[in-house]
Amino acid sequence: MNLNNVYNFKNPVKHFLNIDNLEFPSNITEYPIDNLTWTEPIKFRIYKEKDKYRTLKMPNILNFVAAYYHYKNLPEFEDIQSSDWVHKRLVANVDTGDFASGQYDLQLEGDFNCLCIYDNLIRLDIKEYYGRIYTHNLDFSNQEERYLTNMNTGATNGLLMGNYLSLYFAEEYLSKISHSLENKFIENEIECDFSYFSDDFYFFCNKKDNEEVVRIFDEVLESYNLERSDKKRIWTYESFNNYNLVARYWKKLVAHCNMRFKSEKTNNKLYFINQMVYRMSNLDDDKLKRVFINNVFKIRYFRELPLEKFQVKEYDYHQLCFLMNFSPEAMLYSVDRFAEMKAFKKEKLHHFFKVRYRECLKKNYNEEQLYYFYAISIFGYSDIIEENKGLVAKSNNQILISYYLRDNLFGQEEINFLKNLTDEEYWFQNYHLILYSSELMNDIEASIENFLIPKTVVLSQCNKQSKSNKREEYMKFYKTNLENEKAIIREIPFVKEVISEYLELKMKESEKMFEDSDKWGE
């Protein structure tokens, strides 16, 4: 098991972390709950839509790994969909740390089939679902609940967003909601096929039943102390068909570009970049456009394209910059290939990265800041990295700050600023602050006490032996890893390698899915 995949499920930030590199207690697979205390997660902000962001919360690593081993044998733990095969759309793959490839296309076909049968599709979702789950209502199968709540300062109201454990419990709870909905539709004699992806529900029904379907959804949610968000979309076959163009577009793009490519030539044009800009302009919303851009760079066509047989025109540079600016995540899957391309003049992108990185650091999107840092590192723009150290120090991006600490990029002014951030919520960057400071390492136990020990068991709070024992466990964990120079972040060349391995797994998974679907159709 790759612990990074469960610590940050789905989010690409997992590629930058190396939790498996850390040394854990020898009894971590059966770690006593009495060795753990309430801990505070770090906040990591990711882009949601327009000017909004969502906050992921990454739990204390010792607490999380202990919880993972405690819960990993629960029913359907690595096969979430099996808890509700009929209605659940979400298929998780812990080997890739992502949702299974190919499922979207299969489910889309099912949606169109339903829209041939029913008048419309109503899409509804649950308001602030993760934040409103009461942990006492979850089924722990007689396992200890505190492994979960200890990761979130002991809170029983709400789950941390971003890790696989929270996903598992949230999906198990959704299975119960789904069962209640099914019974209500049968009880009220309403013809309705429904499915759900996380807290996003798809109801296929006839127009005359629309209001009743929404009413039942509200009623069921209320019985679970939840409520529906204000967002509501109704689709017909025609409107749904016009909206869902992403898969068709990238397939057309590949077919079009393959026809233009001549293997005997060394001056082929990068038509696919122009085609991406053209095709995305026909998509309805920004989310679909970002999915389209990311998917093109993730598929085998681009990853194995013989770029040495292409020339780069001036317009290719500004179109590529446009795509990366629109979807910064795409940089993770593309810049390594362009950096290795002989005809690609990386100096053409220097000003773009100089301006965009600085602007990104002034905003709230931590993951995009990390993507820019990765691309700038791959292209070797060290001047851009260094000149933004002041903004990085105050960015609240603990992962990015840790990279700057590793590379000794901060001056004394920034270091002094960071040393004042002693609250527990800064434990991730403070771990690296100690690791890369000879001064703090020379007095390692005092440094751990000051920057890393959970606030519930700092020395001043240890008025009981049980608290002293807990404090000692965290002290040993941090001290062992710091003394053995174990960073939680990966070196950028290894990030590049891990991303390549992830993409290869995703491509193979997708290819197998379509091979299997072809067999089913025979």
Task: State each model region's role.
Residues 224-236:
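Conserved short beta-strand edge segments in small beta-sheet-based binding/regulatory domains
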Residues 53-83, 127-130, 157-183:
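Conserved pre-motif C helix in the palm subdomain of viral-like polymerases
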Residues 133, 137-138, 142, 195-197, ...:
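Catalytic palm subdomain of template-directed nucleic-acid polymerases
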Residues 1-56, 65, 69-73, 97-100, ...:
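Right-hand nucleic-acid polymerase module
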Residues 106-113, 183-193:
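Catalytic micro-motifs at enzyme active sites that drive phosphoryl/nucleotidyl and oxygen chemistry
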Residues 125, 162, 166, 186-207:
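Catalytic palm active-site di-aspartate
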Residues 49-53, 154-164, 195-202, 275-278:
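Glycine- and acidic
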Residues 160, 164, 203, 233-251:
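Short, conserved secondary-structure transition motifs
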